[in-house]
Amino acid sequence: MVMGLGLFLLVFMLGLGLTSPTLAQDNSRYRDFLSKHYDARPQGRNDRYCDSMMRRQGMTSPCKDINTFIHGNRRSIRAICGDENGNPYGENLRISRTPFQVTTCNLRGGSPRPPCRYRATAGFRNIVVACENGLPVHLDQSIFRP
């Protein structure tokens, strides 16, 4: 009995060792998603907001053409990946059931070289995300819904 329990624990611990990097990678991709697209309490939502946020998030060398920031709470965004606040959309994507407050920053001018200047578009939109292991890892698009 003790031998069987010891073997079980050994196999269990080896399994944890194999899955931990995968879980850590998923968490890393989720944190990257939040870094690029999440701002709980935006200050303003105008062109200056976009210039500042894009610079702060490291998207200005070279200048990124477009980026959308989602405003709200993380739990609601994560819920898109489940049935609580999301529905299947296309292949391997999920669309939010409820609209989110968002700010989309579009690069003004054509040069990808700094200084980068952005035009802000604020609104409420349903968002489409790719999920891995119940976490959003990619913002595919945002859709205005009447």
From Swiss-Prot:
Has weak tRNA ribonuclease activity by itself due to partial autoinhibition by its C-terminus, which folds into a short alpha-helix that partially occludes the substrate-binding site. In absence of stress, the ribonuclease activity is inhibited by RNH1 in the cytoplasm. In response to stress, dissociates from RNH1 in the cytoplasm and associates with cytoplasmic ribosomes with vacant A-sites: ribosomes directly activate the tRNA ribonuclease activity of ANG by refolding the C-terminal alpha-helix. In response to stress, the angiogenic activity of ANG is inhibited by RNH1 in the nucleus. TRNA binds at R45, C105, I127. It holds the Pfam family RnaseA. It is found in: Secreted; Nucleus; Nucleus, Nucleolus; Cytoplasm, Stress granule. One of its GO terms (molecular function) is protein homodimerization activity. One of its GO terms (cellular component) is angiogenin-PRI complex. A motif (Nucleolar localization signal) lies at residues 55-59. Its EC number is 3.1.27.-. Keywords: Angiogenesis, Cytoplasm, Developmental protein, Differentiation, Disulfide bond, DNA-binding, Endonuclease, Hydrolase, Nuclease, Nucleus, Protein synthesis inhibitor, Pyrrolidone carboxylic acid, Secreted, Signal, Stress response. InterPro entries: RNaseA (IPR001427), RNaseA-like_dom_sf (IPR036816), RNaseA_AS (IPR023411), RNaseA_domain (IPR023412). Secreted ribonuclease that can either promote or restrict cell proliferation of target cells, depending on the context. Endocytosed in target cells via its receptor PLXNB2 and translocates to the cytoplasm or nucleus. Under stress conditions, localizes to the cytoplasm and promotes the assembly of stress granules (SGs): specifically cleaves a subset of tRNAs within anticodon loops to produce tRNA-derived stress-induced fragments (tiRNAs), resulting in translation repression and inhibition of cell proliferation. tiRNas also prevent formation of apoptosome, thereby promoting cell survival. This is Angiogenin. The gene is ANG.
